[in-house]
Amino acid sequence: MKLPKEGDFITIQSYKHDGRLHRTWRDTMVLKTTENAVIGVNDHTLVTEADGRRWVTREPAIVYFHKKYWFNIIAMIRDNGISYYCNLASPYVLDQEALKYIDYDLDVKVFADGEKKLLDVDEYEIHKKEMHYSPDIDYILKEHVKILVDWINNGKGPFSQSYVNIWYKRYLELRNR
């Protein structure tokens, strides 16, 4: 499949392990694609939940997806600084319809002051039993929490202020042309 180009808009679909559609983001603007990664931006993007509820993202957010890592990263650009929401999730696939991944419940939130919080551990444990996550998936996800925390602690990739600044500036250039 042909990769989307800078300035193209794509749909992002999050699924659960059992194949159910979990959440959809419409019209994420692509900022960069490589063989292994997609960087995009959501800004007042329509989000549809599995139960049909809809909402719109409040602030611009740089989104990062990778084919080798079991997480994706959302850098939310707010008045008080950058906050991050990181989903533990399968590496993405991209087809004609959307960028797709499986959401594995665990999330890491990083506040603008640097505080980190692991979220939804109870939900993960429940879904692990209900949806029969394999021991391999459980191991991979726990290892990727460690990798993610290392990225956070070392300001790697999306956790670098300059990374967010560069991609937000590029978004503004594309939006205003």
UniProtKB/Swiss-Prot annotation:
<feature type="binding site">
    <location>
        <position position="105"/>
    </location>
    <ligand>
        <name>Mg(2+) 2</name>
    </ligand>
</feature>
<comment type="similarity">
    <text>Belongs to the Ntdp family.</text>
</comment>
<comment type="function">
    <text>Has nucleoside phosphatase activity towards nucleoside triphosphates and nucleoside diphosphates.</text>
</comment>
<feature type="binding site">
    <location>
        <position position="107"/>
    </location>
    <ligand>
        <name>Mg(2+) 1</name>
    </ligand>
</feature>
<dbReference type="Pfam" id="PF04167">
    <property type="entry name" value="DUF402"/>
</dbReference>
<feature type="active site" description="Proton donor">
    <location>
        <position position="23"/>
    </location>
</feature>
<keyword id="KW-0378">Hydrolase</keyword>
<feature type="binding site">
    <location>
        <position position="87"/>
    </location>
    <ligand>
        <name>Mg(2+) 1</name>
    </ligand>
</feature>
<feature type="binding site">
    <location>
        <position position="123"/>
    </location>
    <ligand>
        <name>Mg(2+) 2</name>
    </ligand>
</feature>
<protein>
    <recommendedName>
        <fullName>Nucleoside triphosphate/diphosphate phosphatase</fullName>
        <ecNumber>3.6.1.15</ecNumber>
        <ecNumber>3.6.1.6</ecNumber>
    </recommendedName>
</protein>
<dbReference type="GO" id="GO:0017110">
    <property type="term" value="F:nucleoside diphosphate phosphatase activity"/>
</dbReference>
<dbReference type="InterPro" id="IPR050212">
    <property type="entry name" value="Ntdp-like"/>
</dbReference>
<feature type="binding site">
    <location>
        <position position="120"/>
    </location>
    <ligand>
        <name>Mg(2+) 2</name>
    </ligand>
</feature>
<keyword id="KW-0460">Magnesium</keyword>
<feature type="binding site">
    <location>
        <position position="103"/>
    </location>
    <ligand>
        <name>Mg(2+) 1</name>
    </ligand>
</feature>
<dbReference type="InterPro" id="IPR016882">
    <property type="entry name" value="SA1684"/>
</dbReference>
<keyword id="KW-0479">Metal-binding</keyword>
<feature type="binding site">
    <location>
        <position position="107"/>
    </location>
    <ligand>
        <name>Mg(2+) 2</name>
    </ligand>
</feature>
<dbReference type="InterPro" id="IPR007295">
    <property type="entry name" value="DUF402"/>
</dbReference>
<dbReference type="GO" id="GO:0017111">
    <property type="term" value="F:ribonucleoside triphosphate phosphatase activity"/>
</dbReference>
<dbReference type="GO" id="GO:0000287">
    <property type="term" value="F:magnesium ion binding"/>
</dbReference>
<dbReference type="InterPro" id="IPR035930">
    <property type="entry name" value="FomD-like_sf"/>
</dbReference>
